[in-house]
Amino acid sequence: MKIERGYPTYTVTPKAENAIVKGHPWVYDAEILNIEGETANGGLVDVISKKGRYLGTGFLSQQSKIRVRLISRNANDRFDEAFWRRKLQWAWDYRKSVMDPADLDACRVTFGEADAFPGLTVDKFHDLLSVQVLSVGMENLQDLLLPALVDILRRDGQPIRGVFLRNDVALRAKEGLPQGKGWYPLPGETPPDSPVVEIVENGVKYLVDVENGQKTGFFLDQKYNRRAVGRLAAGKTVLDCFTHTGSFALNAALGGAAHVTAVDVSESAVEMARANAERNCMSDVMDCVAANVFDLLPQLEKEPMKYDFIILDPPAFTKSRKTVANAITGYKEINYRAMKLLPRGGYLATCSCSHFATAEKFEAMLRSAAHDAGVQLRQIESRQQSCDHPILWGVDETDYLKFYLFQVV
């Protein structure tokens, strides 16, 4: 029997009810039929069907098209400190259960909706936490959540020194939240002197700048895909395109590649990749080049240098359904060029981090590129984001990374 909690009730359309029943945690503004009661922005509301069936409780976002983000489907939950601490502990215990202890040095601790913390991303980089808050509900709770999470991690032997807020993202404006970044003031503690920390992933050392690095500082979702590349790289001449700070290239070098060329259009990224190569004593086998991959790949067809392993890890070419067609064109161009460069027996690692470029669309693009390049591909494996970025069934938005390893036959 549902306890009386006094939250406002939001009656939703049958379409929204169906989505919620199937596991989706969002209610859009256009799906709300009736509202009874009031609460502040970021406050809790109960969501019910037209027939009065309780569907869940979530945070109200008055300025967002995603008007309610569910956090519970239990009508008797009490949303006190103990509730949130249990959820944080559950999220950390999940990572411990699916990852080797060494992989916990750098991992995602909460992945938004996949962990029922809508709009909250927490990445752990050795002894620093990098946090991004994209919903008003989580913003209102951060003074409860962040100290509690630090306490949970410290009690488990993780020496957390500080928490850095990476709220310098435009998406916050849709929630009516200001942008900014800086150290979160843990009660009674002095923030660390530097936002730069060393992590070790797959045996590779990286310097991560949680203040100035992309997103939260480093892309953790390719952890095991990088390992898969390293496993096949022995003796190969490798071209790593869109290298960013050199992570795939370094895994290939550590895996015994004969030579690696790491390419990125960003001069600063190339400098960081070069520094990471030096840090791992890989400079003798790894060259870092600043170039536009779209221009470079056609040029390489005319060069004597040949590669037998090409890695394509581009940034998201689309962040909306409206631009998917253009994105697919871009993906096809670089994959076609890479396939043309590879000899028989060569390897191709290719991926997309865009949710809107679905696996079906991406695979169709790869078939078309292979046909046009006159090659046949043998799939070694297909992969997704690492398990600390779990895919929650019923929430398609959590399923975004596609990664394929092929051999040209």
Task: List where the protein language model places each region.
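Mobile active-site "lid"/loop adjacent to the S-adenosyl-L-methionine
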Residues: 307-337
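C-terminal catalytic and target-recognition region of SAM-dependent MTase-like enzymes
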Residues: 333, 347-409
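Conserved SAM-binding motif I beta-strand of class I
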Residues: 259-264
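Conserved SAM-binding loop of SAM-dependent methyltransferases across substrates and taxa
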Residues: 245-258
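Conserved class I S-adenosyl-L-methionine
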Residues: 235-244
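Non-catalytic substrate-recognition/targeting regions of SAM-dependent transferases
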Residues: 110-123, 142-218
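Non-catalytic accessory regions of SAM-dependent methyltransferases
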Residues: 1-126
